[in-house]
Swiss-Prot record:
One of its GO terms (cellular component) is virion component. The lineage of its organism: Viruses, Riboviria, Orthornavirae, Pisuviricota, Pisoniviricetes. This is Protein I. CDD domains: embe-CoV_Protein-I_like. The gene encoding this protein is included within the N gene (alternative ORF). Belongs to the coronavirus I protein family. The keyword Transcription regulation does not apply. Structural protein that is not essential for the viral replication either in tissue culture or in its natural host. Confers a small growth advantage. It is found in: Virion.
Amino acid sequence: MESSRRPLGLTKPSVDQIIKIEAEGISQSRLQLLNPTPGVWFPITPGFLALPSSKRERSFSLQKDKECLLPMESPLQSKRDIGIDTTAVLLKHLMGSRSNYCPDGIFTILAQGPMLEPVMETALKVSSGLQTAKRTPIPALILSKGTQAVMRLFLLGLRPARYCLRAFMLKALEGLHLLADLVRGHNPVGQIIALEAVPTSASLPLL
């Protein structure tokens, strides 16, 4: 007698009972559309892709499902596959949103690097007559950091220091040559900028 009694309190429903309760809220016509295979009883909740299965699966409550909104297609993407050129529209979008557009076709990002901000602030203060203290220029800061790095390499040995110094010098020469070509290309004809003679790799001492 005591073993046949059920325990008092809430009991956990079985999987079959959960599926039956959820299926009662779905119309029979909708179940026939979602499950065309006869004999398969599988309620499909919106927002989930389910394949017909002969096994009974546990699904979540229909009331807890959220609507999955499809991403809106932009006008540029809708015109992409029909042969319409959207380059001009994209450039106008970039000009108005994230960058400044120059007539020569160069985009300048609004957010500048942290190392350029002190120089710009100093230049503004000099032009307005509000400069009170002289700041350390950026090349001196870069050179001081490079000197500290080379000194640490010298502590490790002469060979890594010589290798790094040679790499630095080659990169500096490459940058100087590129800068000279860039200046000649951007300046109009008739204006000649006197550049210092750039030493070649042959005139540099071998480290």
